[in-house]
Amino acid sequence: MRYPESLLKLTRALSRLPGIGPKTAQRLALHLAFHKEEAEALAEALEGLKRVRACRECGNLAEGELCPICQDEDRDRSLLAVVESVADLYALERSGEFRGLYHVLGGALNPLEGIGPKELNLEGLFRRLEGVEEVVLATSMTVEGEATALYLAEELKKRGVRVTRPAYGLPVGGSLEYADEVTLGRALEGRRPV
């Protein structure tokens, strides 16, 4: 069956997005074709993305020079969480528990992929340390994330900053039976009194 070219173009564009396969892309395109108000709202939102850029301080997404978090005077400026990506920053923000500032590295050390310290936003991090008392290394629990955390811990300690890592543990609602050995071991190491 032949589809209108504009529908095919939209379907191809949608299918390039993460988590959207060809069938889902086609369903979305058809939905938008029959719901013009939603299509216009989506087009307007996509147009607005042209104003989004990296925050000059932390690397988060911003519509101006600074992101809303860096602009927030109520944030604890003595506390800085280092994350690999903006998605990681948003995950920490959703917890509602972290009230400091963030720094987005833009990845993790990965020599096999040619990603060394110079490929990450480290100079920006080191420039931000004045007034920072604690840096939380909130990198992922992968080999690359751990290597990045170890490297940064050494560099930050040389600069006289307290360095911490988030506690490891079991997920809420998770069963011990299904937890891997490393997670269980770290959960036991990090146990605290009740």
UniProtKB/Swiss-Prot annotation:
A Pfam family hit: RecR_ZnF
SMART domains, sorted: HhH1, TOPRIM
Domain of life of the source: Bacteria
Residue intervals of every C4-type zinc finger in the record: 55-70
InterPro entries: DNA_Rcmb_RecR, Hlx-hairpin-Hlx_DNA-bd_motif, Rcmb_RecR, Rcmb_RecR_Znf, TOPRIM_dom, TOPRIM_RecR
GO biological process, one term: DNA repair
Toprim domain span: 78-171
Keywords: DNA damage, DNA recombination, DNA repair, Metal-binding, Zinc, Zinc-finger
Single GO MF annotation: DNA binding
Signal sequence region: none
TM annotation in the entry: none
Function: May play a role in DNA repair. It seems to be involved in an RecBC-independent recombinational process of DNA repair. It may act with RecF and RecO.
Family: Belongs to the RecR family.
UniProt-listed HAMAP family: RecR
Full protein name: Recombination protein RecR
Source organism (scientific name): Thermus thermophilus (strain ATCC BAA-163 / DSM 7039 / HB27)
UniProt lineage: Bacteria, Thermotogati, Deinococcota, Deinococci, Thermales
Gene: recR
